[in-house]
Regions:
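Beta-strand-turn-beta hairpins that frame and shape the catalytic cleft
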Residues: 1-8, 27-31, 87-94, 120-125
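Binuclear metal-dependent hydrolase catalytic cores centered on His/Asp/Glu-rich metal-binding motifs
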Residues: 1-36, 42-44, 48, 105-109
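Conserved beta-sheet core of the metallophosphoesterase superfamily
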Residues: 39-117
Length: 125
């Protein structure tokens, strides 16, 4: 396709109201970027026609043991979607960022704040 489309859900925590991905009605010929607050959404909801998923919510664990393990991760999937390039069960790439904020406690240990720049390149034959 010729287009890059950006889609997102309103509240990824309320699957009763938002349990249908906005990407389902989009063309598989377009490159679709799905924005979601939590990476769990990309696993709990069929995100058909998504080519790239961008998520946050985990803060990279916020407080980790030397960046290797986070005792508390706000995800049903534990360490699986902690931070970085991940793939959901449908093998769709998902970038989970640490973000720049914190949750209830304004502290970070071995989970630095980050702003991620993503550069897309057209595939050539």
């Amino acid at each position: 396709g010729e287009r890059i489309l950006v889609a997102g859900g309103r509240n990824p925590f309320d699957l009763g109201k938002n349990g249908t991905s906005p990407t389902l009605g989009l063309s598989p010929d377009d490159f679709v970027i799905l924005l979601t607050h939590t990476p769990d959404y990309a696993e709990d909801v069929p995100v058909t026609n998504s080519d790239l998923i961008l998520a946050g919510h985990t803060h990279g664990g916020q407080v980790t043991l030397f960046g290797l393990y986070a005792p508390i991760v706000p995800s049903h999937y534990g360490q699986r979607f902690l931070s970085g390039l991940k793939y959901n069960s449908k093998n769709i790439p998902m970038i989970v960022t640490n973000g720049i904020g914190t949750s209830q406690k304004a502290i970070r240990m071995f989970a630095p704040a980050e702003v991620v720049m993503i550069v897309l390149h057209r595939l050539t034959d």
